[in-house]
């Protein structure tokens, strides 16, 4: 019988994760049509003929909303494992999570007061 230890599973996982993208790119290169021309080098805009410049300046408000979203998305990533193991972690972990949430609330209040969340 073939039995793997914990590290051997990790090695197999890393090998498979390395080979899958290589195989996908190789299959794409082999199966893709080999047409060359100006149409292939043009930009793609939702199936429509491109118009105007491809490089435009975005309003800074988009970046502010994206930054606030990323901050609270990362908060979710950190708090989910804590919530899953909450009953085993004890009071110290609860206090640490409250401090973490308080720091994020202070950041949210700061962004709100500075007008980063208002579009007008």
UniProtKB/Swiss-Prot annotation:
<keyword id="KW-0472">Membrane</keyword>
<keyword id="KW-0520">NAD</keyword>
<dbReference type="InterPro" id="IPR000440">
    <property type="entry name" value="NADH_UbQ/plastoQ_OxRdtase_su3"/>
</dbReference>
<keyword id="KW-0874">Quinone</keyword>
<keyword id="KW-0618">Plastoquinone</keyword>
<dbReference type="Pfam" id="PF00507">
    <property type="entry name" value="Oxidored_q4"/>
</dbReference>
<comment type="function">
    <text>NDH-1 shuttles electrons from an unknown electron donor, via FMN and iron-sulfur (Fe-S) centers, to quinones in the respiratory and/or the photosynthetic chain. The immediate electron acceptor for the enzyme in this species is believed to be plastoquinone. Couples the redox reaction to proton translocation, and thus conserves the redox energy in a proton gradient. Cyanobacterial NDH-1 also plays a role in inorganic carbon-concentration.</text>
</comment>
<protein>
    <recommendedName>
        <fullName>NAD(P)H-quinone oxidoreductase subunit 3</fullName>
        <ecNumber>7.1.1.-</ecNumber>
    </recommendedName>
</protein>
<dbReference type="GO" id="GO:0031676">
    <property type="term" value="C:plasma membrane-derived thylakoid membrane"/>
</dbReference>
<dbReference type="GO" id="GO:0019684">
    <property type="term" value="P:photosynthesis, light reaction"/>
</dbReference>
<feature type="transmembrane region" description="Helical">
    <location>
        <begin position="89"/>
        <end position="109"/>
    </location>
</feature>
<dbReference type="GO" id="GO:0030964">
    <property type="term" value="C:NADH dehydrogenase complex"/>
</dbReference>
<keyword id="KW-0812">Transmembrane</keyword>
<feature type="transmembrane region" description="Helical">
    <location>
        <begin position="10"/>
        <end position="30"/>
    </location>
</feature>
<keyword id="KW-1133">Transmembrane helix</keyword>
<dbReference type="GO" id="GO:0008137">
    <property type="term" value="F:NADH dehydrogenase (ubiquinone) activity"/>
</dbReference>
<keyword id="KW-0521">NADP</keyword>
<dbReference type="InterPro" id="IPR038430">
    <property type="entry name" value="NDAH_ubi_oxred_su3_sf"/>
</dbReference>
<comment type="subunit">
    <text>NDH-1 can be composed of about 15 different subunits; different subcomplexes with different compositions have been identified which probably have different functions.</text>
</comment>
<keyword id="KW-0813">Transport</keyword>
<dbReference type="InterPro" id="IPR023043">
    <property type="entry name" value="NAD(P)H_OxRDtase_bac/plastid"/>
</dbReference>
<dbReference type="GO" id="GO:0048038">
    <property type="term" value="F:quinone binding"/>
</dbReference>
<feature type="transmembrane region" description="Helical">
    <location>
        <begin position="64"/>
        <end position="84"/>
    </location>
</feature>
<keyword id="KW-0793">Thylakoid</keyword>
<comment type="similarity">
    <text>Belongs to the complex I subunit 3 family.</text>
</comment>
<keyword id="KW-1278">Translocase</keyword>
């Amino acid at each position: 019988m073939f039995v793997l230890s914990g590290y051997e599973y990790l090695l197999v996982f890393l090998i498979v994760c390395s080979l899958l993208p290589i195989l996908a790119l190789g299959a794409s290169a082999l199966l893709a049509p080999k047409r060359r021309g100006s149409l292939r080098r043009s930009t793609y805009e939702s199936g429509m003929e491109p118009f105007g410049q491809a490089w435009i300046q975005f309003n800074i408000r988009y970046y502010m909303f994206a930054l606030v979203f990323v901050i609270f998305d990362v908060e979710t990533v950190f708090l989910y494992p804590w919530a899953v193991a909450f009953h085993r972690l004890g009071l110290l972990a609860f206090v640490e999570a409250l401090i973490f949430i308080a720091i994020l609330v202070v950041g949210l209040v700061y962004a709100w007061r500075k007008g980063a969340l208002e579009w007008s």
